[in-house]
Each structure stands twice: as C-alpha cells, then as structure tokens.
Amino acid sequence: QRVFDQAGLFEDQEKKELEELIARERENIGMDLAVVTAFRQEGSSAREYADDFYDGMGLGEGREDSGALYLIYMDGPGEIHGDYYISNFGEMTRLLTDERIRQLGEKAVSRLSVQDYAGSARLVLEEIERYAEAGIVSGQHNYDEETGRVSPHRGIRWYEALAAVGVAGAAAAGA
C-alpha cells in the first residue's frame, strides 16, 4: 500500500488508480512513492508530519531509503482548507531540487484549489516521474542540515565511465 487516505479525500476508484500509478512509477524510477492525506495534528507542521510518516511506515528504496511522499494536510474533517508538503529522501533529493518542488507545488495547488485531491496527487506523481526521466540537474550542491556544510555534488566523469567499461570488459573476457 502506498496511498494512505486518512482524511477520506479519495473515492475507492481513485485510490485504486493512484496505487496502480505509483506501482508503475516505482518500477520505472527505482525509488519509493507515497501519497498521504491526513488531518492537521496539533503541534505538527506538514513537513514534520510527512517526514515522520515516511520514517514511521518504513518507506523508501535502497540503502538510502530513497523516495518521495506527497502529503495533503487538511485543517480538519469537513474543511476545504489545508496545506500540502512534498518530502524527498535519499537519491530523490537529487531529482527533486527546491526549484522542482516549487514547480510541483504550483501545479498541485491548481488542483487542490478546486478540491480535486486525486487529480493533484496524480499530477505530482506524473511530474516526479518526468523529473526522474530528465535526470539530476547539473551544478547541484549537497547541504547537510545538521552541520550546515555545503559540498558540490560530484557525478561520474567521462574517463571514470570509460575506465569502468574497460574493467568490466576485461573481467568478462577473462571469465
């Protein structure tokens, strides 16, 4: 299960379609995805709720628990107002830059503003897959929130890739 509709915003068919979309995208991008709807908890921001939910449910793929969670955080039962948050973890932080998350948010709000909650989730999921296909934005930096340290993200250089291919070829020829 990757759709957690605690606020009851989705119809059964919408949940089914979102689960199917998430399953396909998880297979395509190799990272976890989840959609959560919930009512605002006293003393818990949307970010805190989303991050705690992701960790608490053991979501994530690979050694870095990579993935993203889209939270629709309603003010309360029967309310039409609320907040949203897009959390990213592990390798997903490389794909979902602050700018990409801002763009996702603008698109999500366009659907949330007309109470199209499933449409908002679908749009966010499809855009995340599109960003995954586009790849990591060049010139990124790593920021460690605990230490405040910033370091450049280093990708594989052409000569490193060539050396890896050479080593793999030599190993295959020797086998």
Question: Which stretches of residues belong to each language-model region?
Answer:
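Selective detector of the "anchor" transmembrane alpha-helix that sits immediately C-terminal
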Residues: W158-A175
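Folded, non-transmembrane soluble domains that reside on the lumenal/extracytoplasmic side of membranes
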Residues: Q1-L162
